[in-house]
Amino acid sequence: MLALFLGSLSLIPFLLIVCTAFLKIAMTLLITRNAIGVQQVPPNMALYGIALAATMFVMAPVAHDIQQRVHEHPLELSNADKLQSSLKVVIEPLQRFMTRNTDPDVVAHLLENTQRMWPKEMADQANKNDLLLAIPAFVLSELQAGFEIGFLIYIPFIVIDLIVSNLLLALGMQMVSPMTLSLPLKLLLFVLVSGWSRLLDSLFYSYM
């Protein structure tokens, strides 16, 4: 039992990605960098570090609640039934977080798929609170939300690219790369509107 528990600790990086805010935050930061046009600044490691720090901020209340429950319901490694019962109580805050930030349409779609793909006895018992449904539904919802945010982020930067391209064309300066002028303008716009702060604030508020 102890070996099983220690082995489960190796799943922590996986759970960090699929059960927390990390996926959407990291996606949004990477899409923002690509939208601006600076492919390697900040570097991937820096963006993942920012995403991890932001995830810790978002997940702090959930982690605090889990910590409190661990103190109230110590994990009994010597008894499988007690361990399962304790784990169910301990992970409830995380499951509540995922459910709160999951698109109901995604849950309904997955429930429909269980009727087609799972054995009848499993499908009949499936409900939206099962971790087997909650985790993939949360991941799909985060992916969808991340791409929606990315689309909105791209719009102003595409407008700048179009304006610069048309301006150069009108001036007969086709030999000048539009990126040469649009990149500084996009960086200036992002700095003037406090882009990083506003972006992270929007991500934080999306989990309220």
Swiss-Prot record:
GO terms for cellular component: plasma membrane. GO terms for biological process: protein secretion; symbiont-mediated perturbation of host programmed cell death. The chain crosses the membrane at residues 2-22, 46-66, 149-169, 176-196. Its main location: membrane. It is found in: Cell membrane. The keyword Phosphoprotein does not apply. Required for the secretion of harpin. Belongs to the FliP/MopC/SpaP family. This is Harpin secretion protein HrpW. It comes from Pseudomonas syringae pv. syringae.
